[in-house]
């Protein structure tokens, strides 16, 4: 028997009639389902126990044989086999059709596979199949054309003309079946190949299409006549159940209705044929049978759908697979799980980073089996049943057992929407009272959670392996860095930031200034007793902190700091320098010398000579966390984060910062600024009335004036603000709010957008402190509503984008250590005009070099080939003045079905080299999709009249890039490398002509008159360079340049959109996605290979096909790279399971069946669908078949290695 859980591949083909008979356990002859009195299935009906198996385990229908000991016996009275009732989910029946019936998928799909096989138009097919015309099958000696159509009348006329039996013509699916049987595949294929040598245009396209389908039949071993059914399989009854409702009525699956119609019509047809009924009646019945089978397979595909009660269309077999509610997406890719719960979340500020609070009653329910096992083991109860009763009664002893059980048993917490992998993390449960789950405040950022009523789901990993993986790979304390950019994702926010900001403030002349303390305890004592303030600048003996990395010159001295900073530094890791200034120099190089007293110096003099430092803000805390992580990795960092959190909360509470209306300052010269603006607007309008400017110019000038007025108020606000003002502190520290919120409270609200998106000329002059007038209030409501609707629309759009991205990249996994490629990618900083979008330093970090990098002046080798570039190395390379470096890149990786470690570089989420088995495709998709909601929806207009092209930005632009659509505002590109020799304007046609002189000839390009030029006369341009502003069409670029240029261009474009919105994403994520769009080629000339011209295929398959031919000395095939949008790329994937579960399910399956496609189960989705463990991470073959080995000597493993590999030390198969 086949081991159901271990198979290499899965194939789908057309089912031959003999195959369907071999599946079947009997013929369904009657349309009855169950008897309304006995509620037992009817004999020979759709639920018959003889065919499909017994309804009760180990019991035949009449009850003669009961119990498992009769297993396998067939009852002599009722004919039912004694077996499990589960077989009713797997045993099929069949219906012998009295007339052949065409399968709607193959006749109606686009393109019609039947039509292509027979070289007939779908319309002609429809007329024949539905009995509207005859088709000539064999003309014999008559001048009739084979496959030509005859109407009823023409048929009779021709019969009279040529005599009966002089030619054969039929109608209905039977005729089509006869024609399909006559197709000689080999001959037709040879003929078409011959035709292709000379054909062109429309004729060639059609020939290529036909050749594709005929070749598919030829190679797969499917016979064309199997597209017409003589026998119809009946799916198992438990997959189309009938259930009794409370009121005694029945709810049945729609499929039963559809099968019933087929059986009724089939039986009626059989009776008519027995009675030798007139031809027209039989014909009508055959047509009705055809329609009934069509409705069963795909209701509504042709004509009006068959409806049930309340004119609701019935769900056919195709609908069971399609869409979000279909079998694929509803049951195979997303299942509901047991051992899960859901509750509102509340903040748990006392929790450690790896803990979460679980309510007692929830925990006892989730861990019930574990608790019951312990109760029995401790002999509090004799058996499981008694243990269960104990738990349900709420016996006092169960709580102690529960405490033991949950110790070291992690649980998973998930918050919807799960936009990236940090949306599910593992925690150790801590039992709490109440009914809300408690969440650690620092993980909120990763979950995007807040405590205004959010809910979260909790899941329990059951098996030992699942617990080990949760603990080692998913524990929240391990997820310090964000996979999308490698920056810390657990930065303190709000109160924590505010507390640490307040703590590290400095103030001149506060009580206790100039005191000198011997150590921290003395300073704290002075502060607690009111002798010194947190912000007072005081001295402390350096020797009281001997473990800090002081310079030799700083030891044994007194250092000037504040009491607050002494407390702040006390929680820092010991090896980190003493932080006195909030900057990177202090963090990486050590405390500046100016804070140390020379022997005999007066401390007050030194204090007076020092400037007052700004406090530590959110950004600085982020840098400290990143540095801590870089030096000490996860364990120390997560402990430090907890200390930072506690300190922040404690001091924000002590500071008691509050906000009242009096805290909003009044700007002294607001009236002057506004009067000046009114005056300026009046002048502009006067100039317009005199005809000195156009209306567009006037509009731009007026809105600019008001914008400048708002900025002037903002500037004044910043100048006059008091650093001790609580609102200013909140804003400045990065805890909440920004300058624009502040200026709306204290300055003016400024210009608002009108419903059409255009900015209104009338600004809102009031601020919120003064209060708005009714008209102003009305003006501002529109913006608020638009904000809400935009967000809602954006969320849906962004979610769909993520789904498509995941689908196209889900099979990209790190598959090997090094692919050994000799290609690389030359990179330099990404610029947009003069602005730098992404620096070279950022692009180099965490990548491997392809060639060694030399110092441009000294020629010294800075780093060898194939070396990992660290953060420090990247800085060193850039500081040396290097402008471009050749690195290993995903674009040039030679690994099949994935990427190798060296081409990928470091895993941004851990900061270490990526592991074999990491699902980098999915991570890339999440990293690009997750910030999608932060991107704007709008299409920007480039300032009024300046240009006629709207440049798309934000989310729509990202979609445009990844779907490889023709961009809005397309740039004209040159196909010639050379110099721009002339740009002439032609007023009559409103165009400009650009002439580029190349080596081989002159290129002439017509450009719209209004387009902004990117080149001037004398400029040197490369092939594919843009002559005008705008986006280049990537497909056009691919024709002019090569694949790598297109990949580099798309990468830069994606980065421009995200960086302009302040979102950072690692290059490698975009590289993974873009590579997936360019993994196919189209065969142009097959040479001596047996490839077909026009075929789309994977680059690796194409090179394989050529390899053998080249070795044997033949002519290799030629091809052209193809750029596909992500949706198209997902549907063109080699895995039909993955494609079918994505979109257009019926089309994908139709095509796969004809080709007899094999799915080798390489990606993640395919394996989830068939219920196998995914081939990534610990599910990879090399980590699974492991031989345990004894350790000879005691090995010491450092912390970074104690991750997945330590548990799964793997032997490759």
Swiss-Prot record:
Q: Tell me its cofactors.
A: Mg(2+); Zn(2+)
Question: What terms describe the molecular function in GO for this protein?
Answer: DNA binding; DNA-directed RNA polymerase activity; magnesium ion binding; zinc ion binding
Q: Where does Zn(2+) 2 bind?
A: 819, 893, 900, 903
Reaction(s) this enzyme catalyzes, per UniProt: RNA(n) + a ribonucleoside 5'-triphosphate = RNA(n+1) + diphosphate
The record lists Mg(2+) as bound by 450, 452, 454
Free-text cofactor note: Binds 1 Mg(2+) ion per subunit. Binds 2 Zn(2+) ions per subunit.
- Which InterPro entries would you find in this protein's record? DNA-dir_RpoC_beta_prime, DNA-dir_RpoC_beta_prime_bact, RNA_pol_asu, RNA_pol_N, RNA_pol_Rpb1_1, RNA_pol_Rpb1_3, RNA_pol_Rpb1_3_sf, RNA_pol_Rpb1_4
Q: Which GO terms describe its biological process?
A: DNA-templated transcription
Q: Which UniProt keywords apply?
A: DNA-directed RNA polymerase, Magnesium, Metal-binding, Nucleotidyltransferase, Transcription, Transferase, Zinc
Which is one Gene Ontology cellular component term of this protein?
A: DNA-directed RNA polymerase complex
Q: Tell me which EC number(s) this protein carries.
A: 2.7.7.6
Residues bound to Zn(2+) 1 are 60, 62, 75, 78
The family database entries (SUPFAM superfamilies) matched by this protein are listed as:
beta and beta-prime subunits of DNA dependent RNA-polymerase
Which Pfam families does the UniProt entry name for this protein?
RNA_pol_Rpb1_1 (PF04997), RNA_pol_Rpb1_2 (PF00623), RNA_pol_Rpb1_3 (PF04983), RNA_pol_Rpb1_4 (PF05000), RNA_pol_Rpb1_5 (PF04998)
Q: What is its biological role?
A: DNA-dependent RNA polymerase catalyzes the transcription of DNA into RNA using the four ribonucleoside triphosphates as substrates.
The subunit field of the Swiss-Prot or TrEMBL record says: The RNAP catalytic core consists of 2 alpha, 1 beta, 1 beta' and 1 omega subunit. When a sigma factor is associated with the core the holoenzyme is formed, which can initiate transcription.
- PANTHER family (alphabetical): DNA-DIRECTED RNA POLYMERASE, DNA-DIRECTED RNA POLYMERASE SUBUNIT BETA
Family classification: Belongs to the RNA polymerase beta' chain family.
Protein name as it appears in the record: DNA-directed RNA polymerase subunit beta'
Source organism lineage?
Answer: Bacteria, Bacillati, Bacillota, Bacilli, Lactobacillales
């Amino acid at each position: 028997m086949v081991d159901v859980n271990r198979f290499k591949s899965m194939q789908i083909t057309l089912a031959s009639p003999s195959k369907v008979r071999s599946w079947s356990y009997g013929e369904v002859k009657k349309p009855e389902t169950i008897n309304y009195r006995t509620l037992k299935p009817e004999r020979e009906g759709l639920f018959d126990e003889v065919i499909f198996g017994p309804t009760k385990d180990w019991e035949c229908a009449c009850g003669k044989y009961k119990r498992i000991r009769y297993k396998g016996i067939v009852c002599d009275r009722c004919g039912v086999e004694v077996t499990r009732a589960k077989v009713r989910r797997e045993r099929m029946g069949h219906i012998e059709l009295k007339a052949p019936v065409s399968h709607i998928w193959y006749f109606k799909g686009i393109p019609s596979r039947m039509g292509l096989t027979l070289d007939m138009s779908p319309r002609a097919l429809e007329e024949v199949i539905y009995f509207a015309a005859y088709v000539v099958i064999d003309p014999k000696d008559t001048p009739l054309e084979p496959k030509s159509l005859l109407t009823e009348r023409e048929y009779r006329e021709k019969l009279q003309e040529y005599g009966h039996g002089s030619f054969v013509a039929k109608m209905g699916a039977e005729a089509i079946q006869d024609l399909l049987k006559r197709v000689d595949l080999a001959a037709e294929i040879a003929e078409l190949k011959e035709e292709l040598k000379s054909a062109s245009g429309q004729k060639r396209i059609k020939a290529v299409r036909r050749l594709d389908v005929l070749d598919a039949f030829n190679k797969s071993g499917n016979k064309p006549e199997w597209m017409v059914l003589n026998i119809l399989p009946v799916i198992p009854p438990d997959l189309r159940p009938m259930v009794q409702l409370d009121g005694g009525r029945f709810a049945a699956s729609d499929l039963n209705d559809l099968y019933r119609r087929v059986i009724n019509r089939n039986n009626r047809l059989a009776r008519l044929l027995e009675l030798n009924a007139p031809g027209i009646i039989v014909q009508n019945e055959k047509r009705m049978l055809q329609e009934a089978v069509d409705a069963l397979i795909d209701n509504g595909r042709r004509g009006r759908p068959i409806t049930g009660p309340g004119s609701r269309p019935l769900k056919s077999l195709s609908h069971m697979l399609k869409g979000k509610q279909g079998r694929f997406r509803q049951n195979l890719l997303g299942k509901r799980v047991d051992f899960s719960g859901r509750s509102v979340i509340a903040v748990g500020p006392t929790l450690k980073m790896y803990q979460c609070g679980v309510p007692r009653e929830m925990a006892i329910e989730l861990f019930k089996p574990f608790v019951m096992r312990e109760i029995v083991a401790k002999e509090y109860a004799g058996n499981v049943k008694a243990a269960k009763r104990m738990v349900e009664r709420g016996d006092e002893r169960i709580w102690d057992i529960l405490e033991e059980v949950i110790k070291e048993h992690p649980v998973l917490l998930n918050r919807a929407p799960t936009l990236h992998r940090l949306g599910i993390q593992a925690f150790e449960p801590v039992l709490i009272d109440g009914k809300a789950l408690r969440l650690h405040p620092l993980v909120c950022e990763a979950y995007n959670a807040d405590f205004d009523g959010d809910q979260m789901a909790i899941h329990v990993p059951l098996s030992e392996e699942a617990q080990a993986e949760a603990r080692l790979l998913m524990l929240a304390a391990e997820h310090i860095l964000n996979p999308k950019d490698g920056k810390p994702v657990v930065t303190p926010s709000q109160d924590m930031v505010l507390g640490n900001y307040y703590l590290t403030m400095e103030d001149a002349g506060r009580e206790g200034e100039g005191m000198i303390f011997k150590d921290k305890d003395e300073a704290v004592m002075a502060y607690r007793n009111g002798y010194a303030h947190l912000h007072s600048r005081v001295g402390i003996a350096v020797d009281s902190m001997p473990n800090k990395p002081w310079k030799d010159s700083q030891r044994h001295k007194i250092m000037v700091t504040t009491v607050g900073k002494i407390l702040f530094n006390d929680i820092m890791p010991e090896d980190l320098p003493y932080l006195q200034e909030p900057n990177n120099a202090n963090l990486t190089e050590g405390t500046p010398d100016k804070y140390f007293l020379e022997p005999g110096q007066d401390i007050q003099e030194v204090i007076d000579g020092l400037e007052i430092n700004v406090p530590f803000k959110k950004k600085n805390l982020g840098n400290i966390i990143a540095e801590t992580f870089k030096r000490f990795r996860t364990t120390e960092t997560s402990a430090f984060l907890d200390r930072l959190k506690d300190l922040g909360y404690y001091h924000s509470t002590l500071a008691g910062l509050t906000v009242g209306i009096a805290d909003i300052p009044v700007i002294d010269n607001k009236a002057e600024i506004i009067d000046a603006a009114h005056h300026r607007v009046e002048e502009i309008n006067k100039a317009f009335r005199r005809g000195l400017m156009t209306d567009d110019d006037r509009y731009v000038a007026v809105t600019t004036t008001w914008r400048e007025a708002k900025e002037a108020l903002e500037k004044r606000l910043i100048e006059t603000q008091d650093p001790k003002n609580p609102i200013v502190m909140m804003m400045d520290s990065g805890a909440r709010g920004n300058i624009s919120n502040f200026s709306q409270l204290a300055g003016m609200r400024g210009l608002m957008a009108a419903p059409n998106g255009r900015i209104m000329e009338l600004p809102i002059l009031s601020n919120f402190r003064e209060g708005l007038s009714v008209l102003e209030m009305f003006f501002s409501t529109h913006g608020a509503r638009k904000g809400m609707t935009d967000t809602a629309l954006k969320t849906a759009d962004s979610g769909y984008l993520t789904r498509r991205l995941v689908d196209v990249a889900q099979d990209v996994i790190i598959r090997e250590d090094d692919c050994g490629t000799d290609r690389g990618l030359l990179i330099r900083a990404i610029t947009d005009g003069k602005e730098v979008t992404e620096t070279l330093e950022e692009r180099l970090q965490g990548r491997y070099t392809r060639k060694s990098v030399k110092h441009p002046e000294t020629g010294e080798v800075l780093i060898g080939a194939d070396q990992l570039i660290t953060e420090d190395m990247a800085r060193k390379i850039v500081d040396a003045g290097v402008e471009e470096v050749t690195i290993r890149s995903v674009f040039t990786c030679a690994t099949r079905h994935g990427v190798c470690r060296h081409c990928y570089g470091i895993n941004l989420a851990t900061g270490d080299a990526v592991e074999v088995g990491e699902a980098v495709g999915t991570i890339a998709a999440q990293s690009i999709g997750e910030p999608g909601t932060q991107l704007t929806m709008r299409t920007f207009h480039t300032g009024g009249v300046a240009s006629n092209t709207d440049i798309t930005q934000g989310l729509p632009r990202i979609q445009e890039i990844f779907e490889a659509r023709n961009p809005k505002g397309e740039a004209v590109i040159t196909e010639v490398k050379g110099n721009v020799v002339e740009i002439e304007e032609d007023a009559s046609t409103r165009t400009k002509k650009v002439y580029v002189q190349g080596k081989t000839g002159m290129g002439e390009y017509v450009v719209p008159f209004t387009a902004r030029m990117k080149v001037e006369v004398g400029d040197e341009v490369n092939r594919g360079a843009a002559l005008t502003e705008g986006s280049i069409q990537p497909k056009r670029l691919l024709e002019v340049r090569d694949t790598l240029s297109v990949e580099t261009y798309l990468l830069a474009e994606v980065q421009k959109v995200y960086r302009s919105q302040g979102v950072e994403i690692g290059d490698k994520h975009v590289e993974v996605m873009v590579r997936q769009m360019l993994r196919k080629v189209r065969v142009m000339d097959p040479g001596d290979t047996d490839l077909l011209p026009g075929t789309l295929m994977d680059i690796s398959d194409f090179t394989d096909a050529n390899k053998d031919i080249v070795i044997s000395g033949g002519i290799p095939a030629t091809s052209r790279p193809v750029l596909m949008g992500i949706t198209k790329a997902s549907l063109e994937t080699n895995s039909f399971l993955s494609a079918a579960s994505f979109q257009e399910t019926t089309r994908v399956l139709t095509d796969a069946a004809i080709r007899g496609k094999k799915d080798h189960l390489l990606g993640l989705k395919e394996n989830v669908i068939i219920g196998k463990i995914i081939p990534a991470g610990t599910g990879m073959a090399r980590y699974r078949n492991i031989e345990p080995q004894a350790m000879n000597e005691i090995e010491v493993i450092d912390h970074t290695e104690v991750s997945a590999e330590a548990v799964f030390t793997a032997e490759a198969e």
